[in-house]
C-alpha cells in the first residue's frame, strides 16, 4: 500500500547526468543522435532548452560534462552536443544508485496503487522503460 507523499522530484542536473549516462554509448563518436543535442536533452529530460544550457554550463564547470560540435544523424548542420567526462561517469553512477532506490507509485492492472523501488518499476510493469522514464 502507498504511504504518505511520494511525489518524485529529480534535480535538473541528475536528469541530465542520467540521460547522458544512458547515451554514453555515443561518447566520442563523430555522428550522434538527436538525443545528444540541446533540444534532444530538453525533450527527454522534460526541460526548457534554456534550462539545459544553464545546467550544462554548471556541469562543465564542475568537470562532469564536456561539450563538442558534432554531426547529428538526419540533420545537415552540426550542433553542440555533450557527453560525460570520466569524473562525470563516476558521479553519474553514484547518483544513479540513489535514484534507483527512490520509491515510486505505479498503478497495477486491477487499479491498485503500489509503492515500489524505481529500479523495479519497469520490470514489474513489463515495459522497456529506462530509469529516467520511470522517474519522470
Residues covered by each model-derived region:
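Short alpha-helical segments that sit at the start of domains
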Residues: 1-26
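Alpha-helix N-cap/helix-initiation sites
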Residues: 9-10, 29-34, 49
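Short acidic, hydrophobic short linear motifs in intrinsically disordered regions
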Residues: 27-43
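Short amphipathic alpha-helical interaction segments
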Residues: 46-61
Amino acid at each position: 500500500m502507498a504511504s504518505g507523499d511520494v511525489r518524485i522530484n529529480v534535480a535538473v542536473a541528475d536528469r541530465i547526468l542520467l540521460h547522458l549516462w544512458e547515451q554514453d554509448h555515443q561518447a566520442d563518436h563523430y555522428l550522434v543522435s538527436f538525443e545528444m543535442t540541446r533540444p534532444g536533452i530538453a525533450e527527454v529530460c522534460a526541460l526548457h532548452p534554456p534550462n539545459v544550457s544553464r545546467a550544462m554550463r554548471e556541469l562543465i564547470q564542475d568537470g562532469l560534462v564536456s561539450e563538442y560540435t558534432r554531426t547529428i544523424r538526419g540533420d545537415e548542420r552540426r550542433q553542440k552536443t555533450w557527453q560525460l567526462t570520466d569524473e562525470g561517469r563516476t558521479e553519474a553512477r553514484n547518483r544513479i544508485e540513489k535514484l534507483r532506490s527512490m520509491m515510486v507509485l505505479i498503478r497495477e492492472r486491477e487499479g491498485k496503487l503500489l509503492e515500489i523501488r524505481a529500479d523495479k518499476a519497469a520490470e514489474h510493469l513489463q515495459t522497456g522503460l529506462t530509469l529516467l522514464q520511470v522517474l519522470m
